[in-house]
């Protein structure tokens, strides 16, 4: 697939035709969710945030809006929508949820479910000052280009795991966020 010419219709049909493969037991049982907000445009965008430098965990990192599932959430989808509203003022009613990707185990002990949703192009994003220092949009075709991600094998507590690294403008995209974007690319049939 030529990544430079990805339209929203191309993305939607490929996402809905190719179902994700879940092929292992989760390591973590605490639940969290992130919203992968796809901005509805002729050439769609991918909305990302940069976390506040004042946070205890993952300070300053590029991330999707999201967080832990709490007792008030009816589902992981509800948690992703709640967190997106809290972090960047995306109303849940403005998100057209189209599906989920397989859960990812985080190094902080959560099983994170990526929820894919389409959002309107004219939403007035408002970053939560406590959690988010920046909100930015990356062209989806660029985000899904697998050649932009570089592997790094990390050894922690005797185990090895691979993380992915990339840049977009001044933003360093890596770790779970880069891994989720790569999984989304693979889900829609982008070949390495």
From Swiss-Prot:
Any one GO BP annotation for this protein: nucleoside diphosphate metabolic process
Q: Which cofactor does it need?
A: Mn(2+); Mg(2+)
Q: Which top EC class is given? A: hydrolase
Show the InterPro entries listed in the entry: CoAse, NUDIX_hydrolase-like_dom_sf, NUDIX_hydrolase_dom, NUDIX_hydrolase_NudL_CS, Nudix_NudL
Q: Which UniProt keywords apply?
A: Hydrolase, Magnesium, Manganese, Metal-binding
* Highest taxon of source: Bacteria
Where along this sequence does the record place binding of Mg(2+)? 83, 87
The chain positions of domain Nudix hydrolase read: 29-160
Q: Which family does it belong to?
A: Belongs to the Nudix hydrolase family. PCD1 subfamily.
Biological role:
Probably mediates the hydrolysis of some nucleoside diphosphate derivatives.
Tell me what this protein is called.
Answer: Uncharacterized Nudix hydrolase NudL
Q: Which organism is it from?
A: Shigella flexneri
* High-level lineage: Bacteria, Pseudomonadati, Pseudomonadota, Gammaproteobacteria, Enterobacterales
């Amino acid at each position: 697939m030529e990544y430079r010419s990805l339209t929203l219709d191309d993305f939607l049909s490929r996402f809905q035709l190719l179902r994700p493969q879940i092929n292992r037991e989760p390591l973590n049982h605490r639940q969290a969710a992130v919203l992968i907000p796809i901005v509805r445009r002729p050439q769609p965008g991918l909305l990302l945030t940069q976390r506040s430098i004042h946070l205890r965990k993952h300070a300053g990192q590029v991330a999707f809006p999201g967080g832990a599932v709490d007792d008030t959430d009816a589902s992981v989808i509800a948690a992703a929508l709640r967190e997106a509203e809290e972090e960047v003022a995306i109303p849940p009613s403005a998100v057209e949820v189209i599906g989920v990707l397989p859960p990812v185990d985080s190094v902080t002990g959560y099983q994170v479910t990526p929820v894919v949703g389409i959002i309107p192009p004219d939403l007035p994003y408002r970053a939560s000052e406590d959690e988010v220092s920046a909100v930015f949009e990356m062209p989806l075709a660029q985000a899904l280009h697998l050649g932009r991600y570089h592997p790094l094998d990390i050894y922690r507590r005797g185990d090895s795991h691979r993380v992915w690294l990339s840049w977009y403008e001044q933003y360093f995209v890596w770790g779970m966020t880069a891994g989720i974007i790569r999984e989304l690319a693979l889900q829609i049939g982008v070949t390495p």
